[in-house]
Amino acid sequence: MQYPTIKASQDASDNLGMSTKVTIAEFNEAITDEFCAKYSQDGRKLLKVPYELNGTYSIKEGVRIICDEAFLDLCSLRSLVIPDSVTSIGERAFMCCKSLESLVIPDSVTSIGDSAFMGCGSLRSLVIPDSVTSIGGGAFSGCKSLESLVIPDSVTSIGGGAFRGCYSLTNIVIPNSITSIGARAFEGCEFLTNIAIPDGVTSVGEYAFWGCNSLTNIAIPDGITSIEKRTFLDCKSLSSVVILEGVTSIGDDAFMGCESLNSVIIPDSVTSIGRGAFWGCWSLNSLVIPDSVTSIGDDALRGCTSLTDIVIPDDVTSIGNRAFRGCTSLSSLVIPDSVTSIGESAFGGCNFPNDIEQELISRFGEKIFG
């Protein structure tokens, strides 16, 4: 059967009410092309492509929607031509197309669904057009060969896990239009050396840069009020962090395992330092905790073996369990009268002079050195 040519309407309102999901009725009434790919009766939706398809495939002119899972697990598909009539790429549309090497997304596309290209391990480069406004969660997760990517100014949000596990990605430019970066967005991008978070970003999700081992420096803009837990966990090459005014809390394990971190500026706006926030930051030799901080969480600076001195401000009331445990170079410390609670083993393994140690024991008991 010859597939009829569909003339794409120029009226964007034609897409109103169209879904990337496939109904039973649509599937049963589908038109089949010469490759056994199924299209909706009106030719505006590509429903499903057979697993046997290999090599190169050209989507028919006039298609508006590439439906959810349309190309799922097509392991032999190498290249694809998407016509400029397409406006939406559905969820998991090309998931696990492991041989897909090249792809051009036309200017007509406005949205890329969740996990759309997840696991496309052979995809090396990609240009996202200016028409796209959102990149779904996990959209390019596991694209381990993707080396470069340009995100256009039209995009306002990067979904959770969008580029998770893109091991070959070395550089990415986040445009000023971005306001949010989802959880795990760049997790495991081991060779990403440089990334700038634009001033317009107001939220960065948990684990967003976990394991970005080549990232050397980062600046947190003042629009962000909270550094979420494990945002920079195990960024082993991260040596410098600038946190601008506006951030009020540093979350649990936020910089844990950042073993090259030697400089961090905490602004006066921060009121709490979470559990394990700087645990294992071996190179951190000094830290100024601002007067605004009222609590230091469990394990907050545990294992910071290069830390030689620290000033705890007058408004701190509690220091958590093991907060400074294993800070073997810490030789001087002043704890203000405002502190009423120090957790167990808070200073275990610290080599204080005897007079300082005895003074602390008299105030808080031997448990703090246990």
Question: What residue spans do the PLM features occupy?
Answer:
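Structural signature of tandem-repeat unit edges
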Residues: M1-K38, R44, V49-I65, L74-S88, ...
